[in-house]
Amino acid sequence: MHQVVCATTNPAKIQAILQAFHEIFGEGSCHIASVAVESGVPEQPFGSEETRAGARNRVANARRLLPEADFWVAIEAGIDGDSTFSWVVIENASQRGEARSATLPLPAVILEKVREGEALGPVMSRYTGIDEIGRKEGAIGVFTAGKLTRASVYHQAVILALSPFHNAVYQAL
C-alpha cells in the first residue's frame, strides 16, 4: 500500500489527490495522510513561478515531517494575470511530477480586491456568502455554475502530475 502525504488540510485538495491516486494505482491501494505545512510564499501567490515554488516548498516541508512516506503531494493555487490556477507537485524517493491546472479568468471586481492584497478565498466568500469557499467548490464552482469544482480541476492536474510515476516511457533512456 502506498503511503501518500498530502501537504494540505483543505478538503477539496485532499479529495482530488485521493481520487486521482485511486484511479491510477487502484482503489484501496493508497493510505492518505494530510499535514499542514508552510508554502514559503505569500498566502495569495502571484505568477506561475511563485505558485510553483509554493507547491515545491510544501512538498519539501511534508517530506521533512513524514520522511517515511512513498509520495508527497502539494497543490498550490495562485493568480497569473487575470486568472486563477494551481500547480501540483508530486515527489517520491527518486522523481518529481508537476502539472499546471486549467485556468479560470476572474471578474475585474474580484481581481481588484486580490491585487489590493486580499486572498481570493475570502474575497469570494464575501461576494458569494459561502463561508470558506476555498475549502469547498471554490471560485471555479461559482463561475462555472457547478459544472466544475475546485476539486475536479485539481483532480485533472494530479492525474497529469502522476504520469511519470506509472508510465514506463518516462523511465526510458
Swiss-Prot record:
Pfam families: NTPase_I-T. GO terms for biological process: nucleotide metabolic process; thiamine metabolic process. It catalyses: XTP + H2O = XDP + phosphate + H(+); ITP + H2O = IDP + phosphate + H(+). Phosphatase that hydrolyzes non-canonical purine nucleotides such as XTP and ITP to their respective diphosphate derivatives. Probably excludes non-canonical purines from DNA/RNA precursor pool, thus preventing their incorporation into DNA/RNA and avoiding chromosomal lesions. Belongs to the YjjX NTPase family. NCBIfam families: inosine/xanthosine triphosphatase, PRK05074.1. This is Inosine/xanthosine triphosphatase. It comes from Escherichia coli (strain ATCC 8739 / DSM 1576 / NBRC 3972 / NCIMB 8545 / WDCM 00012 / Crooks).
